[in-house]
Amino acid sequence: MNKSVAPALSRLLRFRYSLRTFLIVATLISAWLAWAAHRARTQRSALEAIQSADGAVSFDYHESGPRTWSYPGRPPRGPQWLRNLLGPQYFDRVTFVSLPGTAVDEKWLKAVNDLPSVKWLRLWGHSGTDASLARLRKSTALLGLQLTSSKISDAGLEHLAKFPNLRWLTLNNTRVTDSGMAHLSQLGSLEELILTNTKVSDASIPAIAGLRKLQLIDLRGTQVTERGAQRIREQAPNLKVLR
């Protein structure tokens, strides 16, 4: 090969490889930007739906502990000029959602399903039903579920299997009975269970004792007897039992 041709060919090959690398990187960046824009639009729409239902949300920078939020919280991520330019939805993640005791609404159900970063979900009154739990999609991020004074029954507890990492579950003032307690065996990470003012009785002791990671259970206002509570303490000596 002519000595003058070889360097030119080498430069051409380097240019081709550099151009190919540039195109690959540009394609990846474009794909990421499109995904980020879609996620931001989805979160913005979800927030609007929740707020229109008189619901409340908190963001990741509000978290001050595993299940505590402080306001205004830590400084949100990202430089302020870029947040102003793009919008907070590109940086912030919703980690807490609370919905009031209104009837089940498809808009807010979709909104919650569109927020995969939610760690704690609170459904009050009519917003917490067997049907609403059935329509919530599977989430490995959800750690806490509060269903205070909701319409949840034994049938609804079957859907808790969709939340395998659930650590805190509140079922006080619900329709839950002994028949539904067996469904809790699917929650191997459960640490705290609030059953106050339900119809749970001593018949649920085997199901409760089977929750190996459980650290606290509140049985006040239930049909569990003092003898039954003592049996739980004997079978699970590290479990704090409130009765």
Protein language model features and the residues they cover:
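N-terminal Lys/Arg-rich, disordered targeting/topogenic segments
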Residues: M1-L13
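LRR N-terminal entry segment and analogous cap-like coil->beta motifs
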Residues: S52-A155, R167-W168
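Leucine-rich repeat
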Residues: Q89-T95, D114-W120, R137-G144, A161-W168, ...
